[in-house]
């Protein structure tokens, strides 16, 4: 799981509202209401946790979590392929919202996996270490992407493809 936490956040950071918001504003030059929708996406996603709990019942949790991660990676690739036209804005925003909903499902299922993998008395410490790794990776990637986004005009595809490749590694590490 530690290796997954080193790789998966690379792709997840690229779908955060702040990053997508900058891309939507600078590259796609969207209206303010679109930026508001992007900012609200995580709140929509949090409401889906109840649904994910029901959908994952009687399913293999690690496999289910891997499918959710794969869905997030597909969203990354859709962003990479989004043309800088109105259709691209729809692809960008839809992918961002879908990825947040899928990520909410992943977080919901992952908590069940953690409860099965770690004894109650060490679970907090173990999951805290995993989250610390993910946070450090997220900070490093966010700090690295900022300057890149300042200097690009429309060439965002490469960073999203790299994020998707890192995410595939995360799926492989989770399945081990």
Label every model-predicted segment.
Residues 1-53:
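Helix-loop boundary and gating motifs at the non-cytosolic
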Residues 6, 75, 87-106:
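Hydrophobic core of transmembrane alpha-helices in multi-pass small-molecule transporters
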Residues 20, 103-118:
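Intracellular juxtamembrane helix-capping segments at the cytosolic ends
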Residues 42-49, 127-146:
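Glycine-rich segments within core transmembrane alpha-helices of 12-TM secondary carriers
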Residues 47-63, 145, 149-150:
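Helix-to-loop junctions at the C-terminal end of transmembrane segments
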Residues 57-72, 153-155:
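Cytoplasmic membrane-interface "Motif A"-like loop-to-helix N-cap segments
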Residues 69-87, 147-150:
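C-terminal ends and interior cores of transmembrane alpha-helices
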Residues 164-176:
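C-terminal membrane-cytosol helix-exit motif in multi-pass small-molecule transporters
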């Amino acid at each position: 799981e530690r290796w997954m936490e080193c790789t998966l956040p690379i792709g997840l950071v690229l779908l955060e509202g702040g990053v997508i918001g900058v891309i939507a504003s600078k590259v796609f030059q969207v209206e303010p209401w679109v930026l508001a929708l992007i900012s609200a996406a995580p709140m929509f996603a949090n409401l889906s946790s109840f649904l994910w709990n029901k959908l994952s019942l009687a399913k293999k949790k690690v496999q289910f979590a891997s499918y959710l991660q794969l869905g997030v990676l597909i969203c990354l690739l859709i962003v990479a392929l989004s043309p800088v036209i109105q259709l691209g804005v729809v692809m960008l925003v839809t992918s961002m919202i879908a990825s947040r909903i899928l990520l909410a499902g992943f977080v919901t299922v992952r908590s069940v996996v953690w409860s099965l993998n770690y004894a109650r008395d060490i679970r907090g410490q173990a999951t805290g270490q995993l989250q610390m790794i993910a946070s450090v990776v997220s900070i490093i990637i966010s700090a690295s992407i900022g300057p890149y986004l300042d200097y690009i005009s429309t060439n965002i595809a490469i960073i999203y493809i790299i994020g998707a490749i890192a995410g595939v590694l995360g799926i492989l590490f989770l399945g081990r």
